[in-house]
Amino acid sequence: MNVNPAGPSPRAVAAACKALSRIDAYPDRESLALVRALARAQGVPEDAIVCGAGASDIIWRLAAAVRPKRIVVCAPTFSEYAEAASYYGACVQEFPLSEADGFDVPASFARAIEGPGDVAYLCNPNNPTGRLVDPRVIDAAACRCEQAGALLVVDECFLGFAPDARERSVAARAACSRHVAVLSAFTKLYGMAGLRLGYLISGNAQLIEGIRRAGQAWPVSSVAEAAGIAALEDVEYVSRTRDVLAGERAWLSHELSSLGLSVVPSDANFLLVRTPAKDIPERLYNQGVLVRTCDSFSVLSRFWCRVAVRTRKENARLAMAFSRALRAEGASGEGEPDERGGASCSGAMAGADGRGSAKEVDTRG
């Protein structure tokens, strides 16, 4: 579970419990109290915010509202962008990231954005790599979208775990732009995965209204709204959580690296780990430890897995399980991983700097 191991703020839990006494009434269609709280927290106008039942809900509603002809995504990245867009007929253009370059997004990503029918997604930090996107890369992509009449969506669901999250957020830019949007949720940092609460910020009034109309009439429950408002107010809890997880992330990364595993440096609450055998996740599972296998991500394989940064006790157990798994005899699937990615439905398009290329894939099957 790559959510805050400390769980939600006690104030958020108390607010949710109190709101249960009002569940006989319909919630506010537009979650105006939450919108006001988000506007204060993010420093953006209220009319630049639309709320939904989690980030995934908004991703699907955006796809339904915009109906893009084509989307541009990094590979690997969160699969929901492509799944939602392809469901509504979009062609998916993948931009492969290189392990040799630390899975960082190169500046040439912007050049894969072509025209008004495009929606480009940047996950910052990226899932599953945990790598932050260089602000200059985001700026180049935003400028390209503004020039081409396209839309850039920056997913900041994991950004709260970064030490300089506020400085790195592009929420302020999105709030005054027709071609940039920021997506975030209360799932990860706030530990509220079960309540389903997310939001999008953009200065594009047509986009905001389209997303609102594309979903159900009451996407946010009164309980989720109350918990979200209280969570935003508990700034100290979030700050303390961020500091603790930063220390645990460094500790776990060191422990896994000392076992000979390749660990991608991360600014999120998870680590991407390269293992020497395909069956390492199975050996971990046999010890009661579950990790996310990454063969479903483009350009990754079964040799890669994503592990959550949790409490010291849980992290120590994970490190010990890895140690035992690596010592186990009879490993299957040894060898170099195949990182060629998914099937291509058109030729590869060379990246501008020669390091990356965009590949068009059809995920509608």
What are the language-model segments listed below?
Residues 1-26, 40, 116:
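N-terminal "arm"/small-domain region of PLP-dependent enzymes with the aminotransferase-like
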Residues 10-12, 30, 179-264:
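PLP-dependent aminotransferase class I/II
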Residues 27, 39-61, 74:
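Short loop-beta-helix segment that forms the pyridoxal 5′-phosphate
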Residues 45-49, 70, 156, 178-179:
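Short acidic capping loops at alpha-helix termini that bridge into adjacent secondary structure
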Residues 65-86, 98:
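Conserved PLP-anchoring active-site segment centered on the Schiff-base-forming lysine
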Residues 93, 99-163:
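Active-site phosphate-binding strand-loop segment of PLP-dependent enzymes
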Residues 245-246, 255-288:
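Conserved PLP-binding catalytic core of the aspartate aminotransferase-like
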Residues 286-287, 296-365:
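PLP-dependent enzyme catalytic core of the Aspartate aminotransferase-like
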